[in-house]
């Protein structure tokens, strides 16, 4: 099975207007990613406010994205839930709609054991025939995969990757030494992409690439061509942007940044709130200093 989980994957925001999906803005956002040749887009993940979507909205979001993309780039759907039955329904619907793969985190809040985490993903694996990326986000889930559980899950034929949002930079080295050769490990943290890939990572699921996909793509291309100096120069230039985009809970800052650049409304669903005035100013200043334009 072809592994789509590699390179630059944009964790896409979900645009809203008047408390409904803004499909016109979605088209602008998706076409911006296609224009700059990202390797894939992730729909309805944490950055996409997936927990605020109804099942009908989830379906409409995926269906519209598939139509816009028209097979130009792979689409990965988020299928995280602390209800295994509901997560299976998301995975089954993703398959039906025609996305190219899906990502899921360990069930949040309920604090399953490692065996429970394994059984959850085994159930998702059985629910469809799509490739799967594990999503390690312990600050969101409250639990995480152990290295042993990742190894067990990697033996299931369609579990092909791990998106790691943790802070343990030894982890990709440890995992790389035990899992199958075609199992990919990507970081979900913009600020550590170079360090992570130096330790065995093969890509990057990025928040910043919602607004600077061209620069993120250039960074990764330089890294893959062994132009470490060039990649580091770009990374250092982007560091203030990474900081600004996480000055408040993701996706609050990136939603405002996208709005400031004309991609969408600055509408975010409760219990999240829009960016504070100080956060807005910080975001505006870095966008101006980097001359970011859409």
UniProtKB/Swiss-Prot annotation:
InterPro entries membership: Aldolase_TIM, DapA, DapA-like, Schiff_base-form_aldolases_AS, Schiff_base-form_aldolases_CS
Residues the record lists as binding pyruvate: 47, 205
Localization per Swiss-Prot or TrEMBL: Cytoplasm
Stored SUPFAM superfamilies: Aldolase
Catalytic activity: L-aspartate 4-semialdehyde + pyruvate = (2S,4S)-4-hydroxy-2,3,4,5-tetrahydrodipicolinate + H2O + H(+)
Primary location group: cytoplasm
GO biological process: diaminopimelate biosynthetic process; glyoxylate catabolic process; lysine biosynthetic process via diaminopimelate
Single GO MF descriptor: (R,S)-4-hydroxy-2-oxoglutarate aldolase activity
Residues of the active site: 135, 163
Chaperone as UniProt keyword: no
Gene Ontology CC annotation, any one: cytoplasm
UniProt keywords, alphabetically: Amino-acid biosynthesis, Cytoplasm, Diaminopimelate biosynthesis, Lyase, Lysine biosynthesis, Schiff base
Enzyme class, spelled out: lyase
Name of one Pfam family that matches: DHDPS
Pathway assigned in UniProt: Amino-acid biosynthesis; L-lysine biosynthesis via DAP pathway; (S)-tetrahydrodipicolinate from L-aspartate: step 3/4
Record EC number: 4.3.3.7
Site (Part of a proton relay during catalysis): 46, 109
Record's signal peptide: none
Assembly information from the UniProt record: Homotetramer; dimer of dimers.
NCBIfam families (alphabetical): dapA (TIGR00674)
Family label: Belongs to the DapA family.
Function recorded in the entry: Catalyzes the condensation of (S)-aspartate-beta-semialdehyde [(S)-ASA] and pyruvate to 4-hydroxy-tetrahydrodipicolinate (HTPA).
Protein name according to UniProt: 4-hydroxy-tetrahydrodipicolinate synthase
Protein source organism: Rickettsia rickettsii (strain Sheila Smith)
């Amino acid at each position: 099975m072809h592994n789509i989980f590699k390179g630059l994957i944009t964790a896409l925001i979900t645009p809203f207007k008047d408390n409904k999906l803004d499909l016109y803005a979605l088209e602008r956002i998706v076409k911006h990613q296609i224009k700059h040749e990202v390797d894939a887009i992730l729909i309805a993940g944490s950055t996409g406010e997936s927990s605020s979507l109804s099942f009908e909205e989830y379906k409409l979001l995926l269906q519209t994205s598939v139509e816009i993309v028209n097979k130009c780039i792979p689409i990965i759907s988020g299928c995280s839930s602390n209800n295994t039955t509901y997560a299976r329904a998301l995975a089954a619907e993703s398959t039906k709609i025609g996305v190219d793969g899906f990502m899921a985190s360990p069930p949040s809040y309920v604090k399953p054991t490692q065996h429970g985490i394994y059984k959850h993903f085994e159930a998702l694996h059985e629910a469809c025939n799509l490739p799967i990326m594990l999503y390690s986000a312990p600050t969101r889930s409250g639990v995480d995969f152990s290295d042993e559980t990742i190894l067990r899950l990697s033996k299931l034929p369609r579990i092909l990757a791990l998106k790691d949002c943790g802070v343990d930079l030894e982890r990709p080295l440890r995992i790389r030494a035990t899992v199958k050769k075609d199992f990919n490990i990507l970081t979900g943290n913009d600020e550590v992409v170079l360090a992570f890939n130096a330790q065995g990572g093969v890509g990057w699921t990025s928040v910043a690439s919602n607004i600077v996909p061209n620069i993120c793509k250039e960074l990764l291309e330089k890294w893959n061509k062994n132009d470490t100096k060039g990649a580091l120069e770009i990374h250092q230039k982007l560091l203030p942007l990474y900081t600004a985009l996480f000055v408040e809970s993701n996706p609050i800052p990136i939603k405002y940044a996208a709005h400031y650049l004309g991609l969408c409304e600055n509408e975010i669903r409760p219990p999240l709130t829009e960016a504070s005035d100080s956060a807005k100013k910080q975001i505006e200043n870095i966008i101006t200093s980097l001359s970011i334009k859409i």
